[in-house]
Amino acid sequence: MSWELLLWLLALCALILPLVQLLRFLRADADLTLLWAEWQGRRPEWELTDMVVWVTGASSGIGEELAFQLSKLGVSLVLSARRAQELERVKRRCLENGNLKEKDILVLPLDLTDTSSHEAATKAVLQEFGKIDILVNNGGRSQRSLVLETNLDVFKELINLNYIGTVSLTKCVLPHMIERKQGKIVTVNSIAGIASVSLSSGYCASKHALRGFFNALHSELGQYPGITFCNVYPGPVQSDIVKNAFTEEVTKSMRNNIDQSYKMPTSRCVRLMLISMANDLKEVWISDHPVLLGAYIWQYMPTWAAWLNCKLGKERIQNFKNNLDPDLPYKFLKAKKD
């Protein structure tokens, strides 16, 4: 082979590879590392069997679907949230798979804001199953209100629930994992923990706090390579998170039903989460475009992202004031993409 031909082939590859990556990105519903793991990585069916998994926020949405898909893998489940009746419903749904028995699922009601109860809850799990292999920090609430109209108590509640509660439970479970020198801490964050948006200032703050905390904690536990961390950043997913979101008062939530057809199906989000857990990925972004693209812009071009955020934010706020879905701009952009 002549040098001229070799150089020509190298130049052709240099042109084709970026084009292939661009096409992959345009079709992506997660970051490319996660999608590569989905294609070539380890399967959850191989890696996550025979484990004890504790899921908070398990009464609906991502937490419920995660419990359901984990039940198919034959794990022992601990289901926690405040609503005991809903947890029992989720338990029945998991048992319908036929892979688990009553003794394999522990319903453990838990209020993340009641940090004094976390130590006893952890002991209850260890007494029931003898170990905790995976803690999934999924509990939390969102927010839909303007900063100047929002009572300070709402911001306190968001920090106490989304951040302090998660930190507290993690601190209770970690000594057990350190003693065993193994375990997984999975934290369901949000794209809002990367790219801040209007009407969710307190929620964004709590999610940014989680990102900083778990990145720092990971570095502190470097001497325990068997303890791994996975921070999951979903975009819009079909769930009740907006319906249950705080508004300007702690006692008020959105409670209005909105169109969720443009959001990612919960089952797809959870499947990608399981793949990230099976492959020990440290940080994963799970979202359709244009939100996924927005996360990349925030990461690599923050000045431009801030300008774009202000432009879209005006429309979000106007829709909110008109009692419309604030996310209509993203819905429109996704419809154009589809």
From Swiss-Prot:
Residues 1-28 form the signal peptide. The keyword Oxidoreductase applies. One of its GO terms (cellular component) is endoplasmic reticulum membrane. Substrate binds at S190. SUPFAM superfamilies: NAD(P)-binding Rossmann-fold domains. Keywords: Endoplasmic reticulum, Membrane, NAD, NADP, Oxidoreductase, Signal. NAD(+) binds at S60, I62, Y203, K207, S239. The keyword Hydrolase does not apply. InterPro entries: NAD(P)-bd_dom_sf, Sc_DH/Rdtase_CS, SDR_fam, SDR_family_member_7. Gene3D superfamilies: NAD(P)-binding Rossmann-like Domain. It holds the Pfam family adh_short. Its EC number is 1.1.1.-. It is found in: Endoplasmic reticulum membrane. NADPH-dependent oxidoreductase which catalyzes the reduction of a variety of compounds bearing carbonyl groups including steroids, retinoids and xenobiotics. Catalyzes the reduction/inactivation of 5alpha-dihydrotestosterone to 3alpha-androstanediol, with a possible role in the modulation of androgen receptor function. Involved in the reduction of all-trans-retinal to all-trans-retinol. Converts cortisone to 20beta-dihydrocortisone in vitro, although the physiological relevance of this activity is questionable. Belongs to the short-chain dehydrogenases/reductases (SDR) family. This is Dehydrogenase/reductase SDR family member 7. The lineage of its organism: Eukaryota, Metazoa, Chordata, Craniata, Vertebrata.
